[in-house]
Amino acid sequence: FIAGVAIMLYTMASFLVFYLIQGTLTLPGIAAMLLGIGMAVDASIITFERIKDQLKIGVPLEKAVKLGNEESLSSILDANITTFIIAVILFILGQSSVKGFATMLIINIILTIAILVYLEKYVILLFAKSGVFDNKINLFIGLPKKKIIPAKEVRIPFKKLDFVNSRKIMLPIILIVIVGGLTYSLIKGFNFAVDFTGGTSITVNTTDKVSLDGYTIDKINSTKDSTTITIKEKLNKDEVKELSKKLEEEYNTSADIYVVSDLVKKQLIKNAIIAVLVAFLGITAYVSIRFRFNYAISGIVALLHDVLITTIFFGVFKLEIDSIFIAALLTIIGYSINDTIVTFDMIRRNYKNRKNIDKEKLKDIVNDSVRLTFFRSIMTTVTTIIPIICLIIFGASEILNFNLALLVGFIAGVFSSIYVSNQLWLILESRRITKPKKEKKKLDEVEELKVKGVNC
């Protein structure tokens, strides 16, 4: 109930702030809002799962709420800060529609921390201190009283799932899919939009069949309400006016003409490459500071997996790759690292609680950490992709590819957070702890200082 009210308050606050800054709510902006709601739900799930863990081991309600909030804080902050880095990059390097998406995402992240972390924490603590729920712990855990059995330590769910051993099957499958899909896409060629090929894109808002004579047609895409024709010629201002007038007279409707010169094309490609590289560097730096470098490397490889899977999906099904697709990739990177960091935080906590770490204990740490965050990962992904599926079915055709990219990327992200990032971290950490330490050379006696021309 508290989480539901907090989510409603968060949504209203997002619209209010966007209105106060006089932002234009575009379709990508709505998509950012839905993504933000998913991240807000994630913050609530993490907090309540930590509180439930404490209640299950017999900790009193008020203390359980305090401990649960303390334990969840680092996960939520780390996850949101990495996504914030992506949003800032999008805002700086993106175009108008992408800037709208980034602006809404930045607002959502700030409000998530303000409302879903601090305000919700304060309200839950007030309920706990009231004493009303001291004998109604089952309302917080979500289990009947008969099934609540206090334990000495947090019970590990999904004990039958061995994520570490199953990597022997899953990692080769991932490798085959990526290599096979990428090879197929490169041979057949990607369907790049005019943003990356140069030329002129002409969209006529009509249900009639549109034809265009006298130009070198690159491709034609038709929907129920419009037809988009891409030509290789780069029209000047006079040619654009002439063609626009001709199409309006012929089809009695408006025509949107978008010209990408060679200079603009190069700039768009440059911005896309810079955006992705800066995103990776920013995440690597932050994760290295907050965790350790092997966490950062593992996380980056997982992000590459998500980016490649999404790109391969577009390549295999010949979906158009444009500047909005790059925005989708950056969003996927932000969301996926969010998921990965939550699991990394659990690994770090479990690591600190173990002594005399060896390879077998590392496997147990990874397995237990993934099991503890598995339910949260599934629930968060489901609550995020449901609105995206609704946008795919009922939304405008202009952002169909954007939403498809998010859908594929988010599913790939939850998969990589289980079978890529954690498993790679296990390999790197196993090597680190088994690597023989270099012993400092000890001198049995003080060596004579040699000075040229004096004693040598």
Where are these regions (language model features)?
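A structural signal for conserved, well-ordered secondary-structure elements
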Residues: 1-456
